[in-house]
């Protein structure tokens, strides 16, 4: 007969047992059961002692840059252009602008991100007295905002005459009239030396849309915008520099020709460059990383893609500030099938991240993310952040138009950068290198070997609702695991207090919806 113990001694008796579940190294012992991916395991729950709202997701994405939501959008031409990059940054993540376009077009997208939100705007668009109403309307259409200061010479450090707002020009019929005929001259200004906090307070109380900062001679030296003040209130997690500009990243290839592209991106205000290649351990990438670090020391470099410690060591030694992990795991990628090269994502993320952490280099788990749980698993295995392609491709902010599928569903086009559709598309790359062909070392091949496919993804609405769902979901997951931030998650995994369990095929079936005649899978409400 089994002895029934005193229930008050339960915690004491528990000490007689080894920890439930598996240590991460046992879980990922490929000698025992082969390499794993995200669906092959679960994280065991811990103890909840705090609300989910107290969970911090702040993380480093490179050596120098920190973001508050560990989410990045992929540099694919059906995922990230300026609209996606702006909104990812506003929501605490980071968008990486694709390079399958002419350099000037990509630089213009970077410029739009950097101009979207500011503290003191040090390089505002300034009009001269000769600028016409029509020209002001064109500038508003180009940049997506109105409210342009007018100075005597049409430049900064020239005497301020007035401000032209969207309301001033919206219904003005004569496009040939000078802006001086419609501009506002009853301005509230602040003197040089005013702090940002003081200037924001003046802006709040003035009820004006813009606050020009002027020197003792009345010359314009910078500008503050009410819309930026409102963005600070509405987007508290925004990824920003101390100057209050949004953080911006963009991709380039490993080709020497892209050194010119890089210069244009830097001139536009780029913060982080992603050297984009399907196989990052190449002499071309190593040379490009060294070139960037030598010539642009203020720009952080993310190298990749890689899946082994050996690849990681080469890029870290070259000076990479961050690493992108994943080869053949993306939803639109067929590299593993066609090239017989790659690695299951869970094994790759753990191996590379554990090694890179010894050098203080953050890693990004790129590919294989099919749902919210996969994001958490990538982070638990050591990634500082997770990069998404197909999960974001169907959102309002991704490039392209919605269309109706043959099944009557609203969808958007989505294609892997290794697909023939990208490699043969000359409409985006223009006269420059095709980014898809460059990424897969195929630009000079007579026969293009596809490493990706083209298709469509279902409408996911706006990322202004979708990304907050992902953030809240990760917070609740960490609460279930019993850790309050990502550093604690990684520390718990490394020291064995955060435990794992393998999943059989039957366990995976059990852990999904089953046994219902019909069901509706609604992921979130807001």
From Swiss-Prot:
Pathway: Secondary metabolite biosynthesis; terpenoid biosynthesis. Disruption phenotype: Increases the sensitivity of P.roqueforti towards MPA and decreases MPA production by the fungus. Its cofactor is K(+). It catalyses: IMP + NAD(+) + H2O = XMP + NADH + H(+). Belongs to the IMPDH/GMPR family. Catalyzes the conversion of inosine 5'-phosphate (IMP) to xanthosine 5'-phosphate (XMP), the first committed and rate-limiting step in the de novo synthesis of guanine nucleotides, and therefore plays an important role in the regulation of cell growth. Part of the gene cluster that mediates the biosynthesis of mycophenolic acid (MPA), the first isolated antibiotic natural product in the world. Does not play a role in the biosynthesis of MPA, but is involved in self resistance to MPA, since MPA acts as an inhibitor of IMP dehydrogenases. Homotetramer. This is Inosine-5'-monophosphate dehydrogenase. It comes from Penicillium roqueforti (strain FM164).
């Amino acid at each position: 007969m089994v002895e029934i113990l005193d229930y008050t001694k339960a915690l004491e008796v528990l000490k007689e047992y080894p920890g439930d579940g598996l240590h991460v190294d046992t879980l990922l012992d490929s000698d025992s059961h082969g390499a794993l991916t995200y669906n092959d395991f679960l994280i065991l729950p811990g103890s909840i002692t705090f609300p989910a709202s107290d969970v911090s997701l702040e993380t480093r994405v490179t050596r120098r840059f920190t973001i508050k939501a560990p989410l990045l959008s992929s540099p694919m031409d059906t995922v990230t252009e300026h609209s996606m990059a702006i909104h990812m940054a506003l929501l605490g993540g980071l968008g990486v602008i694709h390079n399958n376009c002419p350099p000037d077009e990509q630089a213009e997208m970077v410029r739009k991100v950097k101009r979207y939100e500011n503290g003191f705007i040090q390089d505002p668009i300034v009009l001269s007295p000769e600028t016409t109403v029509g020209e002001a309307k064109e500038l508003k259409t180009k940049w997506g905002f109105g409210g342009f200061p007018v100075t005597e010479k049409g430049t900064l450090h020239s005497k301020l005459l007035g401000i032209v707002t969207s309301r001033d020009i919206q219904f003005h019929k004569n496009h040939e009239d000078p802006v001086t005929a419609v501009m506002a001259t009853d301005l509230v200004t602040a003197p040089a030396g005013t702090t940002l906090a003081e200037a924001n307070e003046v802006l709040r109380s003035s009820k004006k849309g813009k606050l020009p900062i002027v020197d003792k001679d009345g010359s314009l030296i910078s500008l503050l915008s009410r819309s930026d003040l409102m963005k600070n209130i509405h987007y508290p997690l925004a990824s920003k520099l101390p100057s209050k500009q949004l953080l911006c990243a963009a991709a380039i290839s490993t080709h020497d020709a892209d050194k010119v592209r890089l210069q244009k991106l830097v001139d536009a205000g780029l913060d982080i460059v992603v050297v984009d290649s399907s196989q990052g351990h190449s002499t071309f990438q190593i040379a490009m990383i060294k070139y960037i670090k030598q010539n642009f020391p203020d720009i952080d470099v993310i190298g990749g893609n890689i899946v082994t410690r050996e690849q990681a060591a080469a890029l870290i030694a070259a000076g990479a500030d961050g690493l992108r992990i994943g080869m053949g795991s993306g939803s639109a990628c067929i590299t593993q099938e066609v090239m017989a090269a790659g690695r299951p994502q869970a094994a790759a993320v753990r191996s590379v991240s554990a090694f890179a952490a010894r050098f203080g280099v953050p890693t990004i788990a790129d590919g294989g993310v099919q749902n919210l749980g996969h994001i958490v698993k990538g982070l638990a295995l050591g990634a500082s952040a997770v990069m998404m392609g197909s999960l974001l491709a169907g959102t309002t902010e991704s490039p392209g138009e919605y269309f109706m599928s043959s099944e009557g569903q609203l969808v958007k086009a989505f294609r892997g950068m290794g697909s023939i559709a990208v490699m043969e598309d000359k409409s985006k790359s223009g006269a420059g290198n095709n980014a898809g062909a460059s990424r897969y070392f195929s630009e000079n091949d007579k026969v293009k070997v596809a490493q990706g496919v083209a298709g469509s993804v279902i409408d996911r609405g706006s990322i202004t609702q979708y990304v907050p769902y992902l953030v809240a979901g990760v917070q609740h997951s960490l609460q279930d695991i019993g850790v309050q931030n990502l550093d604690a998650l990684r520390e718990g995994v490394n020291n064995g207090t955060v435990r794992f369990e393998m999943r059989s095929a039957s366990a995976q079936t059990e852990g999904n919806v089953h046994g219902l005649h019909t069901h509706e899978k609604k992921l979130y409400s807001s």
